[in-house]
Amino acid sequence: MPRKGPVARRDVLPDPIYNSKLVTRLINRIMVDGKRGIAQKILYNAFELVRERSGKDPMEVFDQALKNIMPVLEVKARRVGGANYQVPVEVKPERRTTLGLRWLVNYSRLRGEKTMEERLANEILDAANNTGAAVKKREDTHKMAEANKAFAHYRW
């Protein structure tokens, strides 16, 4: 195994319009095949749709949506004496954000609207209102952790 220590985290630059690193990370999640310009256009147009439909600042709505999506607990598989247990563990802040952004984009892609901008805008609005597939994913993750609470003493 390598012994150089932990790999340094790469820091992203804040995006030009909202001056937010979180928005840059969301753009990076949306981006396919390195097409950053298209990903930016999708996100900014989605934010405009959010502004029109909610009448609020899209950053506030996005922050609320992300708070509603980010999980507090998750389960990790742990092998003990030939059996695999789903052990509930707390999610670290960095991973919470990553999972929230990942679920937001993935469940946006699965929606039925015509354009990705509409899908993303509607998923953000749904998540801000505590509905939608991404919020359901968080609820399911929490349910799994709750159901396996008996194995919490196997934490590492």
Swiss-Prot record:
GO terms for molecular function: rRNA binding; structural constituent of ribosome; tRNA binding. GO terms for biological process: translation. Keywords: Ribonucleoprotein, Ribosomal protein, RNA-binding, rRNA-binding, tRNA-binding. SUPFAM superfamilies: Ribosomal protein S7. The keyword Hydrolase does not apply. One of the primary rRNA binding proteins, it binds directly to 16S rRNA where it nucleates assembly of the head domain of the 30S subunit. Is located at the subunit interface close to the decoding center, probably blocks exit of the E-site tRNA. Belongs to the universal ribosomal protein uS7 family. Part of the 30S ribosomal subunit. Contacts proteins S9 and S11. This is Small ribosomal subunit protein uS7. The lineage of its organism: Bacteria, Bacillati, Bacillota, Bacilli, Bacillales.
